[in-house]
Amino acid sequence: MVRPEDFNSLELDNSLTDGETVHEMMAHKAGLTYNDFNILPGFINFGVHDVSLETNITKDLKIKAPLVSSPMDTVTESGMAIVMALYGGIGIIHGNFPKPEDQAAEVLKVKRFKQGYVMQPHCLSRDSTAFDMIQIKKKYGYTGAPVTEDGRVGSKLIGMVTSRDFDFITMDVAGQKGTPISDTNDVTPTTPITRIMVSVDQLHLGHINDAPELSQKKLKEHRLGKLPIVNDNGELCALLCRSDLLKARDYPMASYDSKGQLLCGAAVNTRGESQYTVDRVVEAGVDVLIIDSSNGSSTYQISMLRYIKEKHPHVQVIAGNVVTRAQAKLLIDQGADGLRIGMGSGSICITQDVMAVGRAQGTAVYDVARYANQRGIPIVADGGIRDVGYITKAISLGASAVMMGGLLAATTEAPGEYFWGPGGVRVKKYRGMGSLDAMEAHASSQDRYFTAESDQIKVAQGVSATMKDRGSCHKFIPYLIRGVQHGMQDIGVRSLRDFREKVDNGIVKFERRSTNAQLEGGVHSLHSFEKRLY
């Protein structure tokens, strides 16, 4: 039987050595990106399910998948952060909100999330009509909705519209309000929802303070599809859904804190006023703070880092962004628990073009990781992740995890509404936090790039764009995880720690790619093709 050590001994035989070590590859000093190299295959003697992706993103914060969603206002709010944590990663809530309390509220939604619970269900109000329910069904696919006094979560629950109330109600093709939608009971689009709904006194209810097991038992005993969750005042707090409860069995890798709540991060800028924001999100239960700045080596970053470590020493802090070892040393010396690496490498970032400052992401990750890892500080590679293979490459260069923006934009869980773009393509808006759109939305985005709100001339370091619909993260994230596992299996490593050790020891070999090699490695020589990834 062939043993892995037999294969490794062949690799160490100079006459049979292919490629070069990572240190040899990076010794040429030219700026390398992820696309400039490949990793050579190793020996496989284990299954893909045996590959562990557990990693640390700070000294004390561990996650089960090396995936972090970027704190951008078109990428991460509570919906994205919840999904990221369910699949073993972590989401970082962006800071481009009108008020600090709004960001804290998003953190709370993540921390209060319970398996099967919908914390922000679409509600109808007392003044809603049958037409409004039909629109919710058409737009979101929901077959029922709670009815509250003013149509919001937190308002008094007065009833529930279920699929049974709408089973025989249909719209005409045009969806005109004057067209009858039922031949029975004289129900029309203008029929008040209060006439159709099941009133609250006829509903089975759960209480917000009940243990999840108790509410789930009530749902099962009464064979309910949905169970409204209320507080002592009868105000709607959440909706427990049978379909979502069944999905809960599919998250064995979920990232939890010591209290059994999902992990969640938040981004804060370097302005002095942001100390109030820090206090609010920490109060909400945030697990890690990211100090959000395009250039992390500044007096402003150091001041914010010191404030957080002095006022909230239990909270982990990822500082950045940095791309050099000198920058890394500065922030580690000031108490950073993790570092965020990248400057100008994101798909919507134009910093390198406009400011003439930045660094190729592959080289930045390698150089900073070599120094930071010696000091026990994990790094998160931020930017330049185009596909699943780039995640594996970032890890090979020393990253503990990758941060994704464009890769997650236009998923169902990303903030914003879909719309139809040119050619009938379903798209969502995606913008860099250094774009004029983001800066005009709120001042906190300007602070990331050291731009004052009063400045009449603003220099954009990002663009606004649209991204094609990627579908739900419930399909996309598992694809990314399994893709990384397959890549590591091909390399012959069982874990990220094993990967890092074999890279450092020169067992894992690399090869730089010529321009033609890059073309050859992609789809080519075809008349037409369809690229379906998952």
From Swiss-Prot:
InterPro entries: Aldolase_TIM, CBS_dom, IMP_DH, IMP_DH/GMP_Rdtase_CS, IMP_DH_GMPRt. NAD(+) binds at D292, S293, S294, G342, M343, G344. It comes from the Eukaryota. IMP binds at S347, D382, G383, G384, G405, G406, Y430, R431, G432, M433, G434, Q461. Residues 117-181, 190-255 form the CBS domain. The active site is at C349 (thioimidate intermediate), R448 (proton acceptor). GO terms for cellular component: cytoplasm. Pathway: Purine metabolism; XMP biosynthesis via de novo pathway; XMP from IMP: step 1/1. One of its GO terms (molecular function) is IMP dehydrogenase activity. Its EC number is 1.1.1.205. Keywords: CBS domain, Cytoplasm, GMP biosynthesis, Metal-binding, NAD, Oxidoreductase, Potassium, Purine biosynthesis, Repeat. Its main location: cytoplasm. Its cofactor is K(+). Mycophenolic acid (MPA) is a non-competitive inhibitor that prevents formation of the closed enzyme conformation by binding to the same site as the amobile flap. In contrast, mizoribine monophosphate (MZP) is a competitive inhibitor that induces the closed conformation. MPA is a potent inhibitor of mammalian IMPDHs but a poor inhibitor of the bacterial enzymes. MZP is a more potent inhibitor of bacterial IMPDH. It catalyses: IMP + NAD(+) + H2O = XMP + NADH + H(+). K(+) binds at G344, G346, C349, E520, G521, G522. It is found in: Cytoplasm. One of its GO terms (biological process) is GTP biosynthetic process. Catalyzes the conversion of inosine 5'-phosphate (IMP) to xanthosine 5'-phosphate (XMP), the first committed and rate-limiting step in the de novo synthesis of guanine nucleotides, and therefore plays an important role in the regulation of cell growth. HAMAP family: IMPDH (MF_01964). Belongs to the IMPDH/GMPR family. Homotetramer. This is Inosine-5'-monophosphate dehydrogenase. It comes from Caenorhabditis elegans.
